[in-house]
């Protein structure tokens, strides 16, 4: 006797439709459209996990640059000064200091200026 795909198909469909939860209209309710949208969504998710790292680095650089200019130095000269002064702080930490601890950041800028 031939075995039908009933339970396997139902499980597969349920899995896709569960992933499509929150999508608009037929992309949530109809298996074929939901499957296409879920595949596309997974591609976007994969791509944007890489993009997120770039976006945060850009944001940190923008914040550091703004804080540097308040202390009369450009971002590139500041980074150069840090390298020459052997101060090993990454951009994430520097951006956090620039936003939350401007006095500490100003001291770091002075050390970077002195090393130039």
From Swiss-Prot:
Output the superkingdom of the source species: Bacteria
GO MF term list: rRNA binding; structural constituent of ribosome
Q: Which gene codes for it? A: rplT
Family statement drawn from the similarity comment of this UniProt entry? Belongs to the bacterial ribosomal protein bL20 family.
Q: Which SUPFAM superfamilies match?
A: Ribosomal protein L20
One GO BP annotation is:
translation
Return the HAMAP family for the record.
Ribosomal_bL20
Please give the name of this protein: Large ribosomal subunit protein bL20
InterPro entries reported for this sequence: Ribosomal_bL20, RIBOSOMAL_L20_CS, Ribosomal_protein_bL20_C
């Amino acid at each position: 006797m031939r075995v039908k795909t009933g339970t396997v198909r139902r499980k597969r469909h349920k899995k896709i439709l569960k992933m499509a939860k929150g999508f608009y209209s037929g992309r949530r309710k109809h298996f074929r459209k939901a499957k296409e949208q879920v595949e596309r969504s997974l591609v976007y998710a994969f791509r944007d996990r890489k993009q997120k790292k770039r976006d945060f680095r850009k944001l940190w650089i923008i914040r550091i640059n703004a804080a540097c200019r308040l202390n009369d130095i450009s971002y590139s000269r500041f980074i150069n000064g840090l390298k020459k002064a052997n101060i090993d702080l990454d951009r994430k930490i520097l951006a956090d200091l620039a936003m939350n601890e401007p006095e500490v950041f100003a001291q770091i800028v002075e050390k970077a200026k002195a090393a130039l």
